[in-house]
Amino acid sequence: MKKILLTFISALLIGCNTTAPKPKTNTVDGEPEGPHTSVEWKIWAYSTAAPSFIAANCTVVDNDGTVLSEGTNGWTAMSGNMAGPADPENGYRDRHEAISMVGDAESFNWMKGYMDKTKPEMNGDGWIWMLHGDSGVDNFRPYSEGDKANTPEGAWIESGPHLMLMPKDPSTLDGQTTDFNTGSPYLMFEGTDYAHLMIPTEGYYDYQDPLPSIPNLENSNVEPEAPHTSAEWKIWAYSTAAPSFIAANCTVVDMDADGNQIVLREGTNGWTAMAANPRGPADPENGWKDAHEAMPMVGDAQSFAWVSAYFAGTKPKTTMESDGWAWMLHGDMGEDNTKAGVLNKEDSVEGAWIESGPHLMMMPKDQSTLDGQTTDFI
């Protein structure tokens, strides 16, 4: 299977010309009826490893390199299970067994290097979505997929939904943690040519055994029946800008009437939640209309060092130890993507205004590490 997968990845890099006679269906709605060996099921299972706005128009290929569905957006979906299905006659049991993945062009350059056991040759960083998780790996040992028996205690991670950053230069990830039990982005295969960043999303620990100990997790996403000016509601609204495994134990801060920062809840995990809407609530008496209006963000310590540098007009790398991360799962109220500080749509350049939904922000210590990334948010 490994040889087949390597051949397939090489074919992707030079272009495949074998296409299954199946028209593209621009939908990622419910699981199709029928056998899991069918083209229809595979297209659904593989493509939905990415968010719907990528899944709907990505190319989908099978394990042998056959193109099941031609895409238009530069992303490619495939099964990442090098062992193949446990039941070949009936296909993969589910999307998790398939280890479905959706990657951009640079991620396949990374994968080719990994499969060849050579240093990946890349033009820029690559990204891979795996919203159905994987089958497990030793976090510190490349080529350990499925080898739990020979993995030291505490090193095995079977991931749920996540996004991966495959760096052109692994040294750009120096300073990131290797601890996968905190919910923070963490480094896998540290110290090798295949070091990459794992970015957990909601449900990340659904397959992990034993589960990490995360206090207060059960009720972290339940909106309280309380005034939107209350500490109780603000704690919920601000903290849930991050996945539950971070939201449950982050510090939550607010501003008092005099503009002084106050702590609504002390946290334990190094993340801090706050409202980031500089305009304030449209209705000050009743507070934020909803969590979206508050524009809450949950950031790690390095992201706040970036924010401090931004407002001070200094370079972030003078105050940051590594890249920072900030979750905004309730989105924001909009800004100009090309001009810092433009928060009114009427002042924005035409075509540059973006009001974001749920997202995660990477705040780089060195902006040059993002060279080559697109500015196209459409």
Feature map (PLM): residue ranges:
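Sec-dependent signal peptide recognition
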Residues: 2-7
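Intrinsically disordered, low-complexity proline-rich regions
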Residues: 20-24
